Amino acid sequence: MDSNTVSSFQVDCFLWHVRKRFADQELGDAPFLDRLRRDQKSLRGRGSTLGLDIETATRAGKQIVERILEEESDEALKMTIASVPASRYLTDMTLEEMSRDWFMLMPKQKVAGSLCIRMDQAIMDKNIILKANFSVIFDRLETLILLRAFTEEGAIVGEISPLPSLPGHIDEDVKNAIGVLIGGLEWNDNTVRVSETLQRFAWRSSNEDGRPPLPPKQKRKMARTIESEV
């Protein structure tokens, strides 16, 4: 196993521990708590894949961070912070909408790279909107936290989420996953539109009503792809 992979996991575990202590003091805002919960799942998946104990890794990560801080001057820290571009966290969904459990009568699932696409194909003739929470840098989607499809009544009928064991995706991955989700939902005569935030940074639809321009052939192809890979 590559030593950089192990040490990266150890540092991530310790930094998550620090953030958790911060949140336990009720100091974190909604986006902070959002990322904390998602990163916990990611660390568990990585730990399982690597065969490493999280508690042991956290202790090792603490030693690595302490060694770095001992060598770090205040001036170097200021220069590092100034040179790193700042990302923005955008939210379509509330914390309740993100954390709510949901169930599917006819579950369909597809894994596309490091993203998992899930939908309930029992849903028919509904008006559906896609909402997402994600970070943006240089006016492009940086990291998808979670995307969900909601009916007008507020029911969750679809979802795109990063796989904890396979971190890392780009905006094109998210765009392709959105296309697959829309194709599957529109196969059952649902009307799907995308939130303004998603249109701007992830989908860039030219339609004024936020409906992505998917031709019928592409819809059918996407729906068949989901069915064939479940």
From Swiss-Prot:
The record's account of how the chain is modified after translation: Upon interferon induction, ISGylated via host HERC5; this results in the impairment of NS1 interaction with RNA targets due to its inability to form homodimers and to interact with host EIF2AK2/PKR.
Keywords, in A-Z order: Eukaryotic host gene expression shutoff by virus, Host cytoplasm, Host gene expression shutoff by virus, Host mRNA suppression by virus, Host nucleus, Host-virus interaction, Inhibition of host innate immune response by virus, Inhibition of host interferon signaling pathway by virus, Inhibition of host PKR by virus, Inhibition of host pre-mRNA processing by virus, Inhibition of host RIG-I by virus, Inhibition of host RLR pathway by virus, Interferon antiviral system evasion, RNA-binding, Ubl conjugation, Viral immunoevasion
Motif, Nuclear localization signal: chain positions: 34-38
Ranges for region PABPN1-binding: 223-230
Region (CPSF4-binding): 180-215
Gene Ontology molecular function: any one: RNA binding
Region entry RNA-binding and homodimerization, spans: 1-73
Region (Disordered): 205-230
Chain location of the short sequence motif Nuclear export signal per the record: 137-146
GO cellular component, one term: host cell nucleus
Tagged with keyword Nucleotidyltransferase: no
Main location: host cell
Tree of life domain: Viruses
GO BP annotations, alphabetical order: symbiont-mediated suppression of host cytoplasmic pattern recognition receptor signaling pathway via inhibition of RIG-I activity; symbiont-mediated suppression of host gene expression; symbiont-mediated suppression of host mRNA processing; symbiont-mediated suppression of host PKR/eIFalpha signaling; symbiont-mediated suppression of host type I interferon-mediated signaling pathway
Homology family: Belongs to the influenza A viruses NS1 family.
Biological role stated in the UniProt entry: Inhibits post-transcriptional processing of cellular pre-mRNA, by binding and inhibiting two cellular proteins that are required for the 3'-end processing of cellular pre-mRNAs: the 30 kDa cleavage and polyadenylation specificity factor/CPSF4 and the poly(A)-binding protein 2/PABPN1. In turn, unprocessed 3' end pre-mRNAs accumulate in the host nucleus and are no longer exported to the cytoplasm. Cellular protein synthesis is thereby shut off very early after virus infection.
Subunit composition and interactions: Homodimer. Interacts with host TRIM25 (via coiled coil); this interaction specifically inhibits TRIM25 multimerization and TRIM25-mediated RIGI CARD ubiquitination. Interacts with human EIF2AK2/PKR, CPSF4, IVNS1ABP and PABPN1.
Domain notes: The dsRNA-binding region is required for suppression of RNA silencing.
Protein name, per record: Non-structural protein 1
Organism the protein comes from: Influenza A virus (strain A/Turkey/Ontario/6118/1968 H8N4)
Encoding gene (name): NS
